[in-house]
């Protein structure tokens, strides 16, 4: 970051590759091994953000980039907030398919909200689709609030119990 002649700027890394969403669409669904590897890299990125007091608030496959050399990067911190600051959602909220129940209610977002969204992302990697869908954003948000998440193992029986438990955590 810096300032030059009264103009502020941020220098960011250029990451060439594809989004995790595109990758899932190409493959249909990922193997447990591959999904776990990607989830671990996302977790490391979230840990770095959280350790620096930043909550992402919009973790989803569209905001995860897989570089051409296979590295996974968490991108688009556009609605991120400092965890020490006001993290009450106003009109800005993460994508409804990946939003935590707290975000769906318009309430407090913290590190747990990012972890919930990571769980939904893992579910999509393992099954090829999101667990809750609907005709409107409100319908999807209500499902996050009112319905229990079914484990990915119910759709893909070969998913290990341990992986299923992590997604449901």
Model-derived features with residue positions:
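Conserved ATP-binding/catalytic core of the eukaryotic-like protein kinase fold
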Residues: 1-139, 144
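Short proline-rich PxxP-based motifs
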Residues: 145-157
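Conserved C-terminal C-lobe helix
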Residues: 158-169
């Amino acid at each position: 970051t810096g300032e030059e002649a009264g103009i502020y700027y941020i220098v960011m890394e250029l990451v060439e590759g594809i989004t995790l969403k595109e990758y899932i669409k190409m493959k249909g669904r990922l193997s447990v091994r591959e999904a776990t590897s990607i989830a671990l890299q996302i977790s490391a990125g979230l840990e770095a953000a959280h350790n620096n007091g930043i909550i992402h608030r919009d973790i989803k496959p569209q905001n995860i980039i897989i570089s051409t050399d296979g590295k996974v990067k968490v991108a688009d911190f556009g609605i991120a907030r400092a965890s020490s600051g006001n993290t009450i959602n106003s009109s800005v909220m993460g994508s409804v398919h990946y939003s935590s129940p707290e975000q769906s209610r318009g309430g407090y977002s913290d590190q747990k909200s990012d972890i919930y969204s990571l769980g939904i992302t893992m579910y999509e990697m393992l099954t090829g689709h999101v667990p809750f869908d609907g005709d409107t954003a409100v319908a999807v948000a209500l499902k996050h609030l009112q319905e229990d998440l079914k484990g990915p193992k119910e759709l893909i029986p070969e998913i290990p119990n341990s992986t299923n438990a992590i997604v449901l955590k």
